[in-house]
């Protein structure tokens, strides 16, 4: 019971036993992100209970961002990324199974390949597998495989490798599925009077910080310009980062092509062609 006699509110997610996502994976991912809170990182949804089929979290009301909340999120996200990871594709430290992003599989790299740059990781682990999956569902245009193969050659050669933001280590600790729906802003009525952001539903791994920022842009996060400006002020992004946004969006768009079909396959190929 709360101090006023009210029953604390919770939210329980139910998971399919046959799906790729797993409540214990999500709990481990949330815990890994939450480690950065003590250093000023973004607030993460609190896990209250986890089983093989359910995950119970604090109830998280969502509202319109309060004044300054977008800027606070940008600064805090930079610190979450700065918490780092051992290598690209690194899983949460308390997880040894497969990964997932929504209802799609997501590979982890349990042992870091020597001198594995971001571009090679991105093509090998985040693009090529989803080209195969999307093709299995006939979700890509006829030229899709060839377009991604050509882009893969450039990625593997390191042509799009870029430094992390200033505060981040060589590998950032990223949310991994940071679209607007996984970003909640607590309203002024929040129990603690806190009006900042809370992150939910991660696909946490070692990655490039620009991937999370590109995901925020993909489906239109609220007050995106303020979030990005505050992030850049706290942890300056590498030169030319706006030109790489669409490159980092390729993975989630391919995931959508695999899961939902429709126009996502064509969108993925159009984005890829920008980098040929």
Regions flagged by a language model, labelled:
Residues 85-175, 186-194:
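An alpha-helical support segment within catalytic cores of ATP-dependent transferases
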Residues 256-276:
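ATP/Mg2+ or Mg2+-diphosphate-binding catalytic cores
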Residues 65-73, 122, 263, 267-270:
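Domain-level recognition of nuclease-like catalytic cores that cleave nucleotide substrates
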Residues 17, 50-54, 61-63, 127, ...:
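Short, solvent-exposed loop/turn segments at secondary-structure junctions
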Residues 246-254:
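Hydrophobic alpha-helical segments that form the core
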């Amino acid at each position: 019971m709360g101090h006023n006699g009210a029953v604390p509110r919770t939210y329980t997610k139910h998971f399919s036993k046959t799906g790729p996502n797993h409540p214990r994976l999500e709990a481990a991912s949330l815990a890994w992100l939450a480690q950065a809170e003590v250093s000023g990182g973004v607030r993460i949804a609190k896990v209250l209970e986890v089983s093989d089929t359910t995950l119970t979290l604090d109830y998280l009301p969502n509202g319109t961002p309060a004044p300054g909340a977008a800027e606070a999120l940008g600064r805090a996200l930079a610190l979450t990324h700065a918490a780092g990871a051992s290598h690209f594709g690194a899983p949460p430290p308390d997880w040894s199974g497969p990964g997932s992003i929504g209802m799609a599989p997501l590979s982890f790299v349990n042992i870091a390949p020597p001198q594995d740059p971001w571009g090679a990781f991105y093509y090998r682990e985040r693009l090529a597998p989803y080209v195969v999956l999307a093709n299995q569902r006939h979700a890509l245009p006829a030229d899709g495989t060839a377009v991604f193969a050509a882009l893969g050659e450039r990625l593997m050669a390191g042509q799009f490798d870029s430094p992390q933001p200033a505060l981040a280590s060589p590998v950032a600790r990223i949310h991994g599925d940071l679209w607007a729906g996984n970003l909640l802003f607590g309203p002024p009525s929040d129990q603690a009077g806190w009006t900042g952001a809370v992150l939910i539903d991660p696909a946490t791994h070692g990655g490039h910080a620009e991937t999370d920022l590109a995901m925020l842009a993909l489906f239109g996060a609220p007050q995106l310009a303020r979030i990005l400006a505050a992030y850049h002020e706290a942890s300056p992004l590498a030169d030319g980062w706006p030109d790489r946004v669409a490159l980092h969006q390729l993975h989630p768009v391919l995931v959508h092509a695999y899961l939902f079909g429709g126009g996502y396959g064509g969108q993925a190929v159009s984005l890829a062609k920008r980098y040929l």
